[in-house]
From Swiss-Prot:
Function summary: Forms part of a macromolecular complex that catalyzes the attachment of specific amino acids to cognate tRNAs during protein synthesis.
Record PTM N-acetylalanine, positions in chain: 54
Places the protein is found: Plastid, Chloroplast; Mitochondrion
Any one GO cellular component localisation term in the record: chloroplast
Protein name: Arginine--tRNA ligase, chloroplastic/mitochondrial
SMART domains: Arg_tRNA_synt_N, DALR_1
Gene: EMB1027
UniProt superkingdom: Eukaryota
Keyword check for Protease: no
Broad EC category: ligase
Organism: Arabidopsis thaliana
Length: 642
């Protein structure tokens, strides 16, 4: 937001200047005069509002948005007949030309050049935009380069003050505010009676990070675990349970043992034993008919699975609310009837389907035997989330292999009028697809027995390797066993998460413990160690950092101090970009670059014992705070010593 002087007379002068600019424009047609009159009325109110806000607000957390609001006023003053033109502000790729750029001049020139404009080209438009830019303490200077690019240099004094305010008020004051109020993030979603494997890792940690970023951005997030807890497979599981444990009340997790082995054994018998297969099919009918004996057995199997899932979620520090397939089952019939009443459902080869333009096959919503399927359940879940949970944004995190399924049922929902045709308008839906996890041989990540890798085994291995690395550094002699164990867990689990999240989610990535546990390069280990080093610098100073926050002053006089400060101030716009594009890798890139900026600063700017010690300790603390917030958003536990 703009930073205007608090002096009332100077604020009134600016308001008058803005109003004068609007009133002293000449127009030649009645239409232009009417448009100008309406614009003058709206802009006069807007100008007063802008000045009032500017007098009371400082840094709101998003540099790009604040600059955009400044240039929005400038655009309205410079080209009042083009009220729909939005400011185009971006961070400068090359810092030597400025910190940010406004790139409106060329596009604006192409709009106005045939309308008898006074301007002679894009550079002139750029100069006019700079001249009309409201005074702001955040802007040190503006200059026009080339074909009208406006380079903006921020005030180092203002930047320092903004960081000081964050140190006092907390980093949550930098959180962006998105236009959406409530979102559903559907992620993880394992199948009952099957162990979570490495494939669930990506959905779980990508979904958790998206949820965390949205929550930080003032969005109410409904974290949904759409577990596979319904379907024909439960017939064979229940029947096998009855055979092994006639007294189902005595069934415990210990008695069943490995649920994955139990599932495979029941599937093996189902495939080979016709009598068992027939019983299993009858069991499905009884389960779906509500038979209490079969419902009880089904609930027992689900409970055992949930216990195993909960252990994984606890280790990953992931929170979810389960609303599986069975939750939506009672609503399916009425949803299908609603679709049918709208003329969307047709008969095809005994099944009931929805034909969709652009797809070779229809979307089946009722099978030929009258049963429901994934599409009917997913459509019902979407209907429920829109109508009962009042979600504005529904995000599904699954592998890219399911893209067509989501495209089809999203299109069916639009055809039904549940969603707008414009996929950028709320309520909206997004499929957040992700690629495969590969082994170092470039093939799908599996064990030697060709089975999928169990997630618990993977986490155990990460923690074990991390602990061994710490012992090799002699930490077992410096720390208590509890400290060693907690740090090994934080580093090991953090390494697994970051190795996934730093990649563009759409790409496949190679799983390598050696790479992810490397303490050099773009790894969680390097970043966690960097944070611990910053904490060590502050501790070694012997200063009370909380007291310095209250009394100390921060300056960004050295080039590396300024570069670090600028990067810190770009945190909010980075989080907003990561949320908007549903890309956690954007935040990972920011975090890694933050550590690189700090390394350059620390290499070139002495902290402890220097004349600038107080200021630089505050900059260290600000860096540590933002790093910790990044770790939190990525679901990684920070370490404070190493």
């Amino acid at each position: 937001m703009f930073i205007f002087p608090k002096d009332e007379n100077r604020r009134e002068t600016l308001t008058t200047k803005l109003r004068f600019s609007a009133d002293h424009l000449t127009f030649t047609t009645v239409t232009e005069k009417l448009r100008a009159t309406a614009w003058r009325f709206a802009f006069s109110s807007r100008a007063k509002s802008v000045v009032a806000m500017a007098a009371n607000e400082e840094f709101t957390g998003n540099l790009k948005r604040q600059l955009a609001k400044l240039f929005d006023v400038s655009l309205k003053l410079t080209v009042p007949d083009e009220p729909s033109v939005e400011p185009l502000v971006a961070a400068s790729a090359l810092g030597k030309f400025g910190d940010y750029q406004c790139n409106n001049a060329m596009g604006l020139w192409s709009i106005i050049k045939g309308k008898g404009t006074q301007f002679k080209g894009p550079p002139a438009v750029g100069q006019a935009l700079v001249k009309s830019l409201p005074t702001s303490e955040m802007v040190e200077s503006c200059s026009v380069a080339g074909p009208g690019f406006i380079n903006v240099v921020l005030s180092a004094k203002w930047m320092a003050k903004s960081i000081e305010n964050m140190l006092i008020d907390g980093v949550d004051t930098w959180a962006p505010t998105l236009s959406v109020k409530r979102a559903v993030v559907d992620f993880s979603s394992p199948n009952i009676a099957k162990e979570m494997h490495v494939g669930h890792l990506r959905s779980t940690i990508i979904g958790d990070t998206l949820a965390r970023m949205l929550e930080y951005s003032h969005v109410e997030v409904l974290r949904r675990n759409h577990v596979g807890d319904w379907g024909t497979q439960f017939g064979m599981l229940i029947e096998y349970l009855f055979e092994k444990f006639p007294d189902t009340d005595s069934v415990t997790e210990t008695a069943i043992g490995d649920l994955q082995v139990f599932y495979k054994a029941s599937k093996h018998k189902f495939d080979l034993d016709e009598a068992f297969k027939e019983k299993a099919q009858q069991a499905v009918v009884r389960l779906q008919g509500g038979d209490p004996v079969y419902r009880k057995a089904w609930a027992k199997i689900c409970d055992i699975s949930r216990t195993e899932f909960a252990k994984v979620y606890q280790r990953l520090r992931v929170e979810l609310e389960e609303k599986g397939e069975s939750f939506y089952n009672p609503h399916i019939a009425k949803v299908i009837e609603e679709l049918n009443s709208k003329g969307l459902v047709e008969e095809s080869e005994g099944a009931r389907v929805i034909f969709l333009e652009g797809f070779d096959i229809p979307l089946m919503v009722v099978k030929s035997d009258g049963g429901f399927n994934y599409a009917s359940t997913d459509l019902t879940a979407l209907w429920y989330r829109l109508n009962e949970e009042k979600a504005e944004w529904i995000i599904y995190v699954t592998d890219v292999g399911q893209q067509q399924h989501f495209n089809m049922f999203f299109k069916a929902a639009r055809k039904a009028g549940w969603l707008p045709d414009n996929d950028k308008t709320y309520p909206r839906v997004n499929h957040v697809g992700f690629g495969l996890v590969l082994g170092e041989d470039g093939k799908r990540f599996r064990t030697r027995a060709t089975d999928v890798v169990r997630l618990v085994d993977l986490l155990d291995e990460a923690k074990t390797r991390s602990k061994l690395a710490l012992i090799e550094r002699g930490k077992d002699k410096e720390w208590t066993p509890e400290e060693l164990d907690q740090t090994a867990e934080a580093v090991g689990y953090g390494a697994v998460k970051y190795a996934d999240l730093k990649n563009n989610r759409l790409t496949n990535y190679t799983f390598s413990f050696d790479q992810m546990l490397n303490d050099k390069g773009n790894t969680a280990v390097y970043l966690l160690y960097a944070h611990a080093r910053i904490c060590s610098i502050i501790r070694k100073s012997g200063k009370d950092i909380d007291e310095l926050k209250k009394t100390g002053k921060l300056a960004l006089d050295h080039a590396d101090e300024r570069a670090l400060g600028l990067h810190l101030l770009r945190f909010a716009e980075t989080v907003e970009e990561a949320c908007t594009n549903l890309l956690p890798s954007v935040l990972c890139e920011y975090l890694y670059n933050l550590s690189e900026h700090f390394t350059r600063f620390y290499s070139n700017c002495q902290v402890n014992g220097s004349p600038e010690e107080t200021s630089r300790l505050l900059l260290c603390e600000a860096t540590a705070i933002v790093m910790r917030k990044c770790f939190h958003l990525l679901g990684i536990t920070p370490v404070y010593k190493i």
